[in-house]
């Protein structure tokens, strides 16, 4: 089946994720289906690279169907996910006359989606927005679940809001324009879903034929893993929208991943690459706590490596690691919470991990 639809069930904030090869070519038709009427103002937020591939055709499709359209391009890179960029979006929104009946469309990767969603949450106290993710990482992770925000010099995503999109449209064809390294980074999040809740997906990713077809970007295989990943995320988000409990398991590998991104400088590692290393650290801690076996850690490590992901821990100062971890949003009552694996497909939340258990992995 070429088209998949997944409901994210959140009461009056529920929405559908539609996965279909080529859906980007007739986006106006999809907007009309979900009740976005003609003549509404649409601010499309993207970046230069994505705009070069899809921008003109995308805007023309909207204009031809009588939508009023403006585009804003975010500079590529984590360093531009900040309040200055947000302020520039507000300026464009004001000049364009974006009102409460208007809509923002995020066309791009995770940075575009995060900033767009937060702009939508805060402009006029909130307007609707749609996610059209164009990277594997944003397809399976950041476009679903409503986490939006920008970075602060003191840490990643410290300024943000939970803001669910009106809809998510995913076109696996856009992955063909990605550098291979970006695709690999997205695979870290897919593998994460396998470790935290979907043993079947993990085993699917281990099969050599599937690996080859995925690396060669075959739509049928891409749709399968995107669909599986989003089903897991949708289920978890529906249980715990605001991350007060079980949703924290989606952060497997992320606490240490954010440390690595922050201390190595945003840009040295892509987000997915940092998460891959973070998953490896969590796996090592799980062995020290007697939670899972060395064989399972090796399976995780080998799978990450097979999709060209790093697992070696960079040299980082121990004191800096503690400082960053204590500033993490996942700290509760002064205690750090870690997501650790018990077996492939099962993880749990722990707040009893002594500093020495993880600091030994850093120089």
Curated annotation (Swiss-Prot):
Residues making up the signal peptide according to the UniProt record: none
Example of a GO biological process term: aromatic amino acid family biosynthetic process
Reaction(s) catalysed (UniProt annotation): 7-phospho-2-dehydro-3-deoxy-D-arabino-heptonate = 3-dehydroquinate + phosphate
InterPro entries: Dehydroquinate_synthase (IPR050071), DHQ_synth_AroB (IPR016037), DHQ_synth_fam (IPR030963), DHQS/DOIS_N (IPR030960), DHQS_C (IPR056179)
Family, as annotated: Belongs to the sugar phosphate cyclases superfamily. Dehydroquinate synthase family.
One of the record's GO molecular function terms: nucleotide binding
Role summary: Catalyzes the conversion of 3-deoxy-D-arabino-heptulosonate 7-phosphate (DAHP) to dehydroquinate (DHQ).
Binding site for NAD(+): 134-135, 147, 156
Keywords, ordered alphabetically: Amino-acid biosynthesis, Aromatic amino acid biosynthesis, Cobalt, Cytoplasm, Lyase, Metal-binding, NAD, Nucleotide-binding, Zinc
NCBIfam families tied to this protein: aroB
Native source species: Prochlorococcus marinus (strain MIT 9312)
Cofactor remark: Binds 1 divalent metal cation per subunit. Can use either Co(2+) or Zn(2+).
Subcellular location: Cytoplasm
Listed EC numbers: 4.2.3.4
Cofactors demanded by this protein: Co(2+); Zn(2+); NAD(+)
GO CC annotation: cytoplasm
Metabolic or biological pathway: Metabolic intermediate biosynthesis; chorismate biosynthesis; chorismate from D-erythrose 4-phosphate and phosphoenolpyruvate: step 2/7
Binding site for Zn(2+): 189, 254, 271
Gene3D superfamilies named in the record: 3.40.50.1970, Dehydroquinate synthase-like - alpha domain (1.20.1090.10)
UniProt name for this protein: 3-dehydroquinate synthase
Pfam families in the record: DHQ_synthase, DHQS_C
Main location group: cytoplasm
Enzyme class: lyase
């Amino acid at each position: 089946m070429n088209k998949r639809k997944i409901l994210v069930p959140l009461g009056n904030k529920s929405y559908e994720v539609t996965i279909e090869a080529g859906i980007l070519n007739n986006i106006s038709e999809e907007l009309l289906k979900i009740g976005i009427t003609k003549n509404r103002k649409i601010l499309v937020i993207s970046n230069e690279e994505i705009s070069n591939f899809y921008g003109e055709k995308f805007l023309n499709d909207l204009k031809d169907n009588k939508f009023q359209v403006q585009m804003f391009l975010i500079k590529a890179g984590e360093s531009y996910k900040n309040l200055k960029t947000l302020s520039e979006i507000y300026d464009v929104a004001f000049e364009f006359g974006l009102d409460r009946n208007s809509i923002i469309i995020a066309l791009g990767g995770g940075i575009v989606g995060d900033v767009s969603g937060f702009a939508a949450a805060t402009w006029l106290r909130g307007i609707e927005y749609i996610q059209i993710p164009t990277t594997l990482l944003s397809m399976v992770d950041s476009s679903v679940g409503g986490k939006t925000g920008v970075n602060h010099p003191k840490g990643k995503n410290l300024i943000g809001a939970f803001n669910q999109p009106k809809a998510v449209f995913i076109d696996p064809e856009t992955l063909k324009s990605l550098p291979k390294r970006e695709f690999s980074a997205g695979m870290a999040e897919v593998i994460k879903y396998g470790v935290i809740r979907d043993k079947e997906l993990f085993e699917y990713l281990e099969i050599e034929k599937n690996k080859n077809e995925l690396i060669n970007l075959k739509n049928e295989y891409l749709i399968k893993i995107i669909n599986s990943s989003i089903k897991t995320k949708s289920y978890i988000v529906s249980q715990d929208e605001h991350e007060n409990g079980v949703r924290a398991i989606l952060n497997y590998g992320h606490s240490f991943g954010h440390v690595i991104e922050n201390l190595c400088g945003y840009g040295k590692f892509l987000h997915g690459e940092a998460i891959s290393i973070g998953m490896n650290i969590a796996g090592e801690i799980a062995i020290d706590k007697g939670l899972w076996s060395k064989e399972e850690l090796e399976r995780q490590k080998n799978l990450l490596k097979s999709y060209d992901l790093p697992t070696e821990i960079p040299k980082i100062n121990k004191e800096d690691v503690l400082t960053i971890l204590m500033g993490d949003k996942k700290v509760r009552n002064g205690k750090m919470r870690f997501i650790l694996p018990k077996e492939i497909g099962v993880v749990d939340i722990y707040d009893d991990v002594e500093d020495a258990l993880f600091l030994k992995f850093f120089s």
